[in-house]
């Protein structure tokens, strides 16, 4: 028994060390100017590097078009479970996005996260710069996916951190934050991880697969938080707060922090503006879920627009597999009649490839497709 326990401890230590090494090596993003400070300068026009559209074609669908709404309490109640599970299945197959109400995350935990996040972005630049991204890292204060000095930039600043597992936290980031902010991240991250696993379990049931086959990929996985700050812009129609893309990870849970809207979802060739419901989360499926379900569910492009007069804040929680896990179609979706549509590679390989490229629609997922 003693030898077995020592072996388990050694394996656990080796896994942690491997995860730490691989998470440090997955990517980098170049340092860029701080947009919040640019906006404070009362610019008459946008600097050229931020101009993405001179004549923007941005077809929005009628205001009555909205992403579906799913009720978590209805999923948990036996009398409404079947109907709500069917609604969830339709939302995932037809939209890849939905709002989740009655989700069970404590209101106080959500409000504390909003407050601490706002206070962080209100800090003087020199204080925020203590948490800036280093030249060889994707985490910290700055912009992600900046891979060249010629690349167009988003009209936004962000603060990205790995929140779970705690042993992957960079010592100069979350541990150095003010205690109230650390506590907010701890409580918020823990409750969102629990919520995400529940959602994935229900998705598995809707798909007719073993729920464990789905949740096992994510239960010990990596949760990352990205806090987004979109300053007011003098020419909002010419820039992107976040350029069109699909999320590369597993499941994304977004919380709107203030009342300013900006998220848009691609649907039927146009863009659907999302009007967040009070206290709801916005859930979207990432590329990894499209791969795992062999295309039964799919990720969807979305973008963030900015406001001419007001700032917008949001925080996204991303749930991904462990770095040593394989990412590929689950066995439930492969048969002689239905071959694999995507390659199988390790999560470490997957994310290294992702972070070496600029965000561009679903182009990275396309690289994972098996060409027949």
UniProtKB/Swiss-Prot annotation:
A Pfam short name: 2OG-FeII_Oxy
GO MF entries: 2-oxoglutarate-dependent dioxygenase activity; metal ion binding
Pathway the protein takes part in: Flavonoid metabolism
Organism ancestry: Eukaryota, Viridiplantae, Streptophyta, Embryophyta, Tracheophyta
Family label: Belongs to the iron/ascorbate-dependent oxidoreductase family.
Domain Fe2OG dioxygenase per the UniProt entry, residue ranges: 221-321
SUPFAM superfamilies in the cross-refs: Clavaminate synthase-like (SSF51197)
Gene3D superfamilies, per the entry: B-lactam Antibiotic, Isopenicillin N Synthase, Chain (2.60.120.330)
The protein's name: Oxoglutarate-dependent flavonoid 7-O-demethylase 1
Gene expressing this chain: F7ODM1
Enzyme class, broadest EC rank: oxidoreductase
Tissue-level expression: Accumulates in the trichomes of nevadensin-accumulating strains (e.g. cv. SD and cv. EMX-1) and in cv. SW (at protein level) but not in cv. MC.
GO process terms (BP): coumarin biosynthetic process; response to molecule of fungal origin
Biological role stated in the UniProt entry: Oxoglutarate-dependent dioxygenase (2-ODD) acting as a flavonoid 7-O-demethylase involved in the biosynthesis of polymethoxylated flavonoids natural products such as nevadensin and salvigenin, aroma compounds which contribute to the flavor of sweet basil, and exhibit pharmacological activities such as anti-allergic, anti-oxidant, antibacterial, anti-proliferative, and anti-inflammatory effects. Catalyzes the 7-O-demethylation of methoxylated flavones; mediates the conversion of 8-hydroxysalvigenin (8-OH-SALV) to pilosin (PIL) and of gardenin B (GARD B) to nevadensin (NEV).
Cellular component GO terms, alphabetical: cytoplasm
Statement on biotechnological application from the UniProt entry: Nevadensin is a selective inhibitor of human carboxylesterase 1 (hCE-1), a key enzyme responsible for the hydrolysis of a wide range of endogenous and xenobiotic esters.
């Amino acid at each position: 028994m003693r030898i077995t326990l020592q072996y388990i401890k050694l394996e656990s230590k080796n896994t942690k060390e491997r995860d730490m090494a691989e998470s440090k090596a997955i990517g980098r993003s170049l340092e860029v100017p701080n947009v919040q400070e640019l906006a404070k300068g009362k610019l008459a026009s946008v600097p050229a590097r931020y101009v993405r559209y001179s004549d923007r074609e941005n077809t929005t669908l009628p205001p009555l078009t909205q992403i579906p709404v799913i009720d978590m309490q209805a999923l948990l109640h036996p009398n409404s479970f079947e109907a709500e599970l069917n609604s969830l299945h339709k939302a995932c197959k037809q939209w890849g996005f939905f709002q989740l109400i009655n989700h069970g995350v404590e209101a106080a935990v959500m409000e504390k996260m909003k407050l601490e996040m706002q206070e962080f972005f209100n800090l003087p630049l020199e204080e925020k710069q203590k948490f800036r991204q280093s030249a060889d890292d994707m985490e910290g204060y700055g912009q992600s996916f900046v891979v060249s000095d010629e690349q167009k930039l988003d009209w936004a600043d962000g603060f990205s951190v790995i929140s779970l597992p705690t042993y992957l936290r960079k010592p100069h980031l979350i541990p150095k934050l003010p205690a109230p902010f650390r506590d907010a991240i701890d409580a918020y991250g823990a409750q969102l991880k629990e919520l995400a696993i529940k959602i994935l379990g229900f998705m598995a049931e809707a798909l007719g697969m073993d729920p464990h086959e789905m949740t096992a990929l994510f239960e010990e996985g990596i949760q990352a938080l990205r806090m987004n700050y979109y300053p007011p812009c003098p020419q909002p129609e010419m820039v992107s707060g976040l350029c069109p893309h699909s999320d590369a990870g597993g499941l994304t849970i977004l919380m709107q922090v203030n009342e300013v809207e900006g998220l848009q979802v691609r649907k039927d060739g146009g863009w659907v503006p999302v009007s967040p419901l009070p206290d709801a989360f916005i859930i979207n499926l990432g590329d990894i879920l499209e791969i795992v379900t062999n295309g039964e569910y799919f990720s969807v492009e979305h973008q963030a627009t900015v406001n001419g007069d007001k700032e917008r804040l949001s925080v996204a929680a991303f749930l991904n597999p462990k770095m040593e896990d394989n990412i590929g179609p689950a066995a439930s979706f492969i048969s002689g009649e239905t071959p694999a549509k995507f390659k199988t590679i390790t999560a470490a390989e997957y994310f290294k490839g992702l972070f070496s490229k600029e965000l561009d629609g679903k182009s990275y997922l396309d690289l994972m497709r098996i060409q027949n």
